[in-house]
Structures are given as C-alpha cells and as structure tokens.
C-alpha cells in the first residue's frame, strides 16, 4: 500500500510539473478579462440576486488564477442537470471580506443557497471536483493570504451548507486524481516548510472523511 501511495504521489508530481512547464491555461483579451458577463434574459432573477449583494456594499472579486476566472460562473454542483450560479465578491467592511455566493435554480428563479467566507487579499482560484464520486462536486478554493502565501480549502455542500473538508492549508500547487485506483479522487498538495523545503501532502478518503494520509519530502524547493 505504501509503495502504491508513493507511486501515486510521483504521478501527481509529474502532472504538476507538466502543467507548470506547458503553461496550461487560456488566453484572454483585456476586454474579456475585465468585462463582466452579460446574463441572458432567462437569468433576470439571478441578476436581481447579484444586485442585492452589490447593493449591500460588496463588489465583484473574481478569482485571479486558473481557468475559472469569471466573477459569475454556472456549474452543476449537485448533479441534477441544472446549473447553480457561483459568484465571487469582496466586502471590505466585513471581518471576512471575501465571499463566494452559491445560488440554486428553483421554479424559474434563483435562491441563495450558501455563502463561503474567507480572509486574505483575494480569491486566488476555484475548481469544481467530485472527489468522492457521489454526484456532487466539492469546491477547491485557493485564498491569496498575502503576496507570499496561498491557502487551499476544500468545501462540501452535501448538507446544503459549506462543510470545510480541508481547512486553509498553505500550498504552492495541487493536483487531484484517482491515484490508488479505488474509484475516489485523492489530492496531492505541494507546499514549503519553514526552511523552504518542498513537501507533498497526500489526502485521501478514510472512513467517509477526507484526511491527510501522509507527507513526503521532495527534492525541489518551493521558492
């Protein structure tokens, strides 16, 4: 089992290095990057929900990295075929200024279902992955804590409200895949220790919980 985990970690590290070398991503024009999406007419009610958040003193704060950088994103989170709306805001007047609002479609309208709150300077990234293959996607949120640090949190919405499976672990990069071939997705997080040595943390499902299974020192530094 230990050898299988080590092989899985090496595979994930290879994937991370490949992505960093290839510069995997998308190219956008300045107009596409800085203009807000125009919602079609059928999303009028959603637009009203968004306006209520803006009128409360918030402003749009889209993720600054990765492929999902729109301030409002449509994603089927619960596997029912209907797309939830995920919207990103900052309200500087609040103790936790960074907000991720989740609106669910219901009877030709949208209702606020949940809010994820965080601290830091910005929302760094967002990814949607069904880690336990139950048909419902978890949210992997990167928070920019300061210019030198990012923190990764993983949230489940199974209960209707955000449940933090991984709580704000520092990271440089991460990858998800079914590394041990058990039908569930594992997570490998690359981070630096206090001496800036590279550490790979391996998270997997154990007894229904997403837990840190092991950590391994790697030769690369995390500068």
Residue ranges and their predicted role:
Residues 7-28:
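Sec-dependent N-terminal signal peptides of Gram-positive bacterial secreted proteins and lipoproteins
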Residues 1-6:
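N-terminal secretory signal peptides that target proteins for export/translocation
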């Amino acid at each position: 089992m230990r050898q299988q985990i080590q092989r899985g970690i090496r595979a994930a590290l290879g994937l991370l290095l490949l992505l960093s070398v290839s510069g995997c991503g998308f190219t956008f024009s300045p107009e596409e990057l800085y203009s807000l999406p125009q919602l079609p007419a059928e999303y009028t009610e959603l637009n009203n929900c968004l306006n209520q958040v803006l009128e409360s003193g918030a402003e749009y704060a889209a993720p600054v990295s990765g492929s999902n950088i729109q301030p409002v994103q449509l994603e089927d989170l619960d596997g029912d075929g209907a797309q939830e709306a995920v919207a990103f805001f900052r309200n500087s007047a609040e103790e936790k200024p960074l907000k991720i609002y989740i609106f669910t479609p219901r009877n030709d309208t949208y209702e606020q279902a949940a809010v994820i709150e965080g601290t830091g300077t910005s929302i760094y990234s967002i990814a949607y992955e069904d880690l336990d293959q139950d048909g419902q996607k978890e949210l992997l949120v990167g928070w920019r804590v300061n210019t030198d640090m990012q923190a990764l949190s993983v949230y489940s919405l199974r209960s209707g409200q955000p449940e933090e499976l991984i709580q704000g672990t520092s990271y440089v990069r991460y990858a998800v895949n079914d590394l041990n071939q058990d039908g569930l997705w594992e997570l490998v997080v690359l981070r630096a220790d206090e001496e800036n040595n590279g550490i790979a943390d391996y998270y997997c499902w154990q007894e229904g919980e997403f837990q840190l299974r092991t950590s391994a020192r790697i030769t690369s530094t995390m500068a």
